[in-house]
Design a protein with these regions (language model features):
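Acidic/polar loop-and-plug regions of large Gram-negative outer-membrane beta-barrel proteins
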Residues: 240-242, 247-322, 348-395, 449-479, ...
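Structural signature of Gram-negative outer-membrane beta-barrels, strongest in the C-terminal barrel
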Residues: 399-403, 413, 417-429, 442, ...
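C-terminal beta-signal and adjacent terminal beta-strands/loops
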Residues: 620, 658, 711-719, 737-793
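Gram-negative outer-membrane beta-barrel transporters
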Residues: 496, 609, 616-618, 635-721, ...
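N-terminal periplasmic accessory domains that precede
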Residues: 79-82, 101-106, 116-119, 136-139, ...
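Transmembrane beta-barrel wall of Gram-negative outer-membrane proteins
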Residues: 181-183, 188-292, 315-329, 505
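Short acidic/polar hinge/loop motifs at secondary-structure boundaries
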Residues: 124-153
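Extracytoplasmic beta-strand/coil segments of soluble accessory domains associated
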Residues: 30-32, 48, 52, 80-124
């Protein structure tokens, strides 16, 4: 090997061992002089029929893997933000630690993450990938208990697990090994970040192994809301029993974490949207409308003064318990694998949702057809009529979640080189929802906004404690879903170089639910109290949802090995996305059909890695819902198609230097979408790429690695009509990792160190709403720094 970096050389030489799918001790085969270990040797388990997995070079699909070091080097601000290292994926992390919008390969959606499934040790955390106000990355926190991440794009995923046609993100936990190990990590940073991570594992005797770990963190947040924006933690444990021919393991995880959720703020837009700047009094990189003035509120939700106490600090968080396990066994030529997962808990959203652009207070008062005056709700005197104000809703969404999943597979070699796998997947899940959407407040358009009360001269009362309205939607609903699927997969090594895999899946989904009817009332019966004249109330009567759907999915893949350094693959699949709870509630009952085609190249030596994938996909029956600028609640169903090219790779030309990168070119268009046919699929850039140079030094007392990542995000459109253009932007992250001796590690990193003002979304709740150069949008966070010190044993 030509590198002076023993740590890097070792990582290549034992790639297969480090990424082995089961927890039994693996022995790495030494690399001979005429055989180079490459990333193609790494064993992956996601998207494979058997629990043993297969080498990357033999996989006829696109998959990205990341070790703990690579995860740390990505400087992620959240679980969703970590996905920026995956080509073909666009994650919008600007909402904070949770509640991201994640898009995959031009697959159409207005937000959330309907084409992303989060797995823990191969089991989906929650079977439906997205509910309104809940995308699956919200349910997971990355910490030092994670051994690696595997991200499968398309490929064979429509056949296995929950049949996700888009992106499957599998976080694989560390398990106990023969040698005890552990770590303690302390992290600090700007915005008063304080965090501790712990991990410990080892043998218990008689083939039993354990691991425990978790974290606790508190911070003022990437945008300081005048209270702890992110506060909470997680605890995990695994227990494993190993035999010569199998393994049984269990895990438990409790997550109780609250995260402030950030939505659009006013910005200044000039030069046809190419030049963005901060709105006066509200810094685009660090500012937020959130503040202590309305952190704790009493929402008026019913007659006779009925109120609901809510706290913004609870944010978009989770209080979730997860319990699961897996059993892998080989006997008499048969292989049995079973995975199960149980989840129970709550995932609320208490957040501020903005609407139209700011205006003068005087103009706001005049809109009532009367003169009047205004004062701060919590003291501070009269508010000047020239003060810029806006209306924003204090939304309260409660979700109670429960689910159970089980994935059973039975495999046997039928003849030399041909292995057949049959399996069954079962999921039972529910969500109990209570929503109060609306609750509009009149706020000063400034950092840490303040509520304003208006007194009209004609005697009408426009506000109550700064609230100009109550809920426009009071939703009470209880949903239950059940999915049953049977699948078959055949892997056939036609020759030493040619490998074929085929698969089919039949699935049936049954959904029932009760949605309470609503009515709109004047809560106090007094038309002069304007703030409660149009209040949505849930009634005792309900509307029944009862729908059964079934579908067949299939896939075929071919992998051709050119030599030990190069292979080609082709893949075609046809999958579905069943309508979710919220789709069925809104009358969107069609099953979405997804067809995908892929061609790829995988190439690697000790000097370079290269993964190229060309893809094409088509969608039918894709639903869309949005509030347009004219007040129309627009819903539609249409089609789309996308084509693109993904690249992922690295080059190591000399010494400890490496230049890694990912990128995607995407052309995604709507089809059969009324007047929007031919428009670019919303919120997804045509081009994005990331380049990461790094250098590694051996030192007398340890080693040092420095790295930086330059990211470019191309222009996008915030809405279906392509009327809100989001300009391109670039940013720079930096970091360094120092090992001192065998035990100490120091890591320092900075994200967006150039303090770039980049926009991830416009105000999709009111598309096109912009006046006088003022634009409602959600920018990325400004410059952030953090440093950690770890001790390992």
């Amino acid at each position: 090997m030509r590198f002076s970096s023993p740590r890097y050389t070792l990582s290549l030489a034992v790639a297969a061992a480090l990424l082995a799918p089961d927890g039994r001790t693996q022995t790495a085969t030494p690399v001979s002089g005429n055989q180079e270990a490459t990333t193609l040797d790494a064993v992956i388990v996601s998207g494979t029929a058997r629990f043993k997995g297969l080498a990357k070079r033999d996989a006829s699909f696109s998959i990205t893997t990341a070790s703990p070091e690579q995860i740390q080097q990505a400087v992620p601000q959240s679980t969703a933000d970590l996905l920026k290292i995956v080509p073909g994926v666009w994650a919008e992390p600007s909402g904070g630690g949770t509640g991201a919008n994640i898009f995959v390969r031009g697959m159409p959606s207005e937000g959330d993450a309907p084409f992303v499934t989060m797995q823990l040790d191969g089991s989906p955390l929650f079977p439906p990938p997205t509910l309104s106000f809940l995308e699956n990355s919200t349910l997971f926190r990355v910490d030092d208990t994670v051994e690696r991440m595997e991200v499968l794009r398309g490929g064979s995923s429509p056949i296995f697990s929950n049949g996700q046609p888009g992106l499957t993100v599998n976080f694989i936990q560390k398990k106990g090994q023969d040698e005890p190990e552990g770590s303690v990590r302390l992290t600090g940073g700007n915005n008063a970040l304080r965090r501790i991570d712990v991990f410990n594992s080892g043998p218990m005797g008689n083939g039993w192994y354990y691991s425990v770990g978790g974290f606790f963190r508190e911070t003022d947040g990437v945008r300081d809301p005048q209270f702890s924006a992110d506060k909470g933690g997680q605890f995990s444990a695994t227990l494993s029993k190993r035999w010569d021919n199998g393994e049984l393991s269990f895990y438990a995880r409790h997550t109780d974490d609250n995260n402030a959720f950030y939505t659009a703020i006013p910005l200044l837009s000039r030069n046809n949207g190419n030049d963005l700047s901060s709105f006066p009094g509200l810094n685009a990189q660090t500012g937020t409308l959130l503040g202590r003035d309305f952190r704790n509120v009493d929402l008026l939700v019913g007659p006779d003064g009925q109120t609901l106490r809510r706290d913004l600090a609870d944010g978009r968080g989770v209080n979730i318990d997860v319990f699961g396990g897996e059993w892998n066994w080989e006997s008499g030529g048969w292989t049995v694998a079973d995975r199960f997962n149980v989840i129970s808990g709550s995932a609320p959203t208490y957040a501020l949702f903005t609407g139209d652009a700011p205006q003068r207070l005087g103009d706001f008062i005049a809109s009532y057809g009367s003169s009047g005056s205004a004062s701060y709700t919590n003291g501070g005197g009269v508010v000047d009529a020239n003060q810029q104000v806006l209306e924003a809703g204090w939304w309260s969404v409660d979700k109670r979640l429960n689910s159970f999943t089980n994935d059973l597979r039975l495999s046997r070699e039928l003849f030399a080189g041909n292995t057949l796998t049959v399996g069954a997947y079962y999921a039972k899940y529910s969500s109990a929802d209570t929503w109060y959407l609306g609750n509009t407040m009149l706020l000063t358009a400034q950092n840490n906004a303040r509520r304003i009360d208006v007194a009209l001269d004609d005697g009408r009362q426009a506000t109550r404690q700064g609230f100009t309205s109550t809920a426009f939607l009071n939703l009470r609903a209880k949903y239950d879903g059940e999915n049953i699927a049977a699948f078959v997969a055949d892997e056939w090594e036609l020759s030493e170089r040619l490998r074929l895999d085929l698969g089919a899946r039949y699935e049936r989904q049954s959904v029932t639910g009760d949605v309470h009817d609503t009515t709109t009332v004047d809560l106090d019966g007094n038309p002069a109290t304007l703030y409660d004249n149009a209040t949505s109330l849930a009634l005792a009567t309900t509307r029944r949802i009862d729908q059964n759907d079934e579908a067949l999915s299939w896939t075929a893949g071919l992998n051709f090995t050119l030599d030990q350094h190069n292979s080609l693959f082709a893949r075609v699949n046809s999958g579905v996305k069943f309508p979710g709870f919220d789709n069925l509630r809104d009358g969107q009952t069609r099953v979405q059909d997804v067809d995908q085609y892929e061609l790829g190249l995988k190439s690697g030596t000790s000097v370079y890695d290269l993964y190229l994938t060309a893809f094409y996909n088509t969608f039918k029956n894709s639903p869309f819902q949005a509030f347009l600028a004219n007040g129309e609640n627009f819903t539609a169903v249409g089609d789309s198609r996308a084509r693109g090219l993904e690249v992922e790779g690295a080059i190591r030309p000399f010494g400890g230097f490496e230049l890694a990168g990912t990128g995607v070119w995407l052309d995604a268009k709507y089809r059969n979408y009324r007047e929007f046919t031919g428009n670019q699929v919303m919120r997804q850039p045509k081009r994005q790429f990331r380049i990461t140079p790094s250098y590694y030094w051996m030192l007398p007392f340890g080693d040092l690695k420095v790295f930086a990542t330059y990211s470019y995000i191309g222009e996008r459109f915030a809405d279906l009509a392509n009327s809100q253009r989001l300009p391109s932007y670039d940013m720079l992250d930096i970091g360094a990792n120092l090992h001192v001796g065998e035990h100490w590690e120091v890591t320092a990193s900075g994200s967006n160190v150039t303090d770039t003002l980049g926009l991830t979304e416009g105000n999709v709740r009111v598309p096109g709403a912009a006046t006088g150069g003022v634009f409602m949008g959600r920018p990325i966070a400004g410059r952030q720094y953090q440093m950690s010190v770890a001790y390992r044993w």
